[in-house]
Amino acid sequence: MNRPAWLMARPVAHRGLHDKTSGLIENSCAAAQAAIDHDCAIECDIQLSADGDAMVFHDFTLDRLTNQQGRVDSMTAQQLSSLQLVGSQDTIPTLTAFLELIAGRVPLVCEIKSRFDGDLRLLNRAVDIAKQYQGPLVFKSFDPALVAALRRIAPDMP
């Protein structure tokens, strides 16, 4: 596979340019904006909500970054989007909202989180959203089955 030149053209801010002491929480819109302001590409993580939307959040549980407990996939996108991230005014963004903020200004590396159970709903939702996006975007996953499915579902995506 050919690696797009834009992928390595600038530093990549892992989960955005976050700094908890400054209220810039990982995978938040504020951390994404900070990365954009510093001309960094952004790496983010996505997970599936209970109602099938792609949410930008790293952990499988809410405990570390919100005042809620439980699994991310047990709440709807609307519920998750209303949860404030600890130490900031930000809430958990949908992938759609995250892409609207980035608006192609910097490249995005989007990690599709997996429980290694063969569930392709998040992958399918992410690809559907990405097809509407005009900016530089690449998906990654540590789940080989998801990567193989991505090659089948969207062979032209980097």
Where are these regions (language model features)?
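Phosphate-group recognition and catalysis centered on beta-loop-alpha active-site segments
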Residues: 1-158
